[in-house]
Amino acid sequence: MSVAAEGRRLLRLEVRNAQTPIERKPPWIKTRARIGPEYTELKNLVRREGLHTVCEEAGCPNIFECWEDREATFLIGGDQCTRRCDFCQIDTGKPAELDRDEPRRVADSVRTMGLRYATVTGVARDDLPDGGAWLYAATVRAIKELNPSTGVELLIPDFNGEPTRLAEVFESGPEVLAHNVETVPRIFKRIRPAFTYRRSLGVLTAARDAGLVTKSNLILGLGETSDEVRTALGDLRDAGCDIVTITQYLRPSARHHPVERWVKPEEFVQFARFAEGLGFAGVLAGPLVRSSYRAGRLYEQARNSRALASR
């Protein structure tokens, strides 16, 4: 019997994925460590205070730039997700009991780190009556109460599209409300079986209607075509998405979806230009871009674009 690292039995899909060896990365999938004073100070602070960020724990290649800008990302809700996406390295299983003190601790970490901009993401909590809506909203409120000058970006699951859950989250007032579509309609069910493409677009529309700046992400290299990417970008813009990031899929382990292709840097430039032509207020595209990369800068760009459009 094959088992995953966390001890559970492998799904048939994971067994099939594992038959494809881990792919060798092309030469452009690399980053240079530019270690500046802000990064060094934050690194020492995080180690000294025993703080936890997605940036370090996920080995993000952009940590040097983001920490130099005093930006960081936090994961809430535990380390077990009730859903399984075929690209995601977070384990699927039964989550621990809800930790109602977590919002305070995250807010304390933001203050201790002196962050200018904080991104908060988390696992899906379908085991909870509200799907975890309180936790997401409470974390934003706690950060803002303790750090009034810090921008907050909230990356959420879909909460099954339930209006009351979404409204609770929206009312917490993050600077940016993000929900990642991640892939194109044709392969969506294969990649994100617990989500639906249209429901994800609906979350973004609801956030826009609530007056929030909205954001989403597309991962390339999962089997989509270039035409499908352009169509998905159009769908996102039509849904009211203000900011989009476009990234290269990097396979976390052999049990995850194989990399179908390595998208060349010049293709990312073309997709970025196409997205800008559609009217997105903020666009970042590249092999090592991640959805929270330069999040604060993208928010400022989108806010300025909105202000100009309203004149």
From Swiss-Prot:
Pathway(s) annotated for this protein in UniProt: Protein modification; protein lipoylation via endogenous pathway; protein N(6)-(lipoyl)lysine from octanoyl-[acyl-carrier-protein]: step 2/2
Presence of the UniProt keyword Iron-sulfur in the record: yes
Keywords tagged on the record: 4Fe-4S, Cytoplasm, Iron, Iron-sulfur, Metal-binding, S-adenosyl-L-methionine, Transferase
Reactions the enzyme catalyzes: [[Fe-S] cluster scaffold protein carrying a second [4Fe-4S](2+) cluster] + N(6)-octanoyl-L-lysyl-[protein] + 2 oxidized [2Fe-2S]-[ferredoxin] + 2 S-adenosyl-L-methionine + 4 H(+) = [[Fe-S] cluster scaffold protein] + N(6)-[(R)-dihydrolipoyl]-L-lysyl-[protein] + 4 Fe(3+) + 2 hydrogen sulfide + 2 5'-deoxyadenosine + 2 L-methionine + 2 reduced [2Fe-2S]-[ferredoxin]
Family under the similarity heading: Belongs to the radical SAM superfamily. Lipoyl synthase family.
Oligomeric and partner information: Forms a complex with GcvH, the H protein of the glycine cleavage system. The strength of association is dependent on the presence of S-adenosyl-L-methionine.
Name of the protein in its database record: Lipoyl synthase
Native organism: Mycobacterium tuberculosis (strain ATCC 25618 / H37Rv)
Gene: lipA
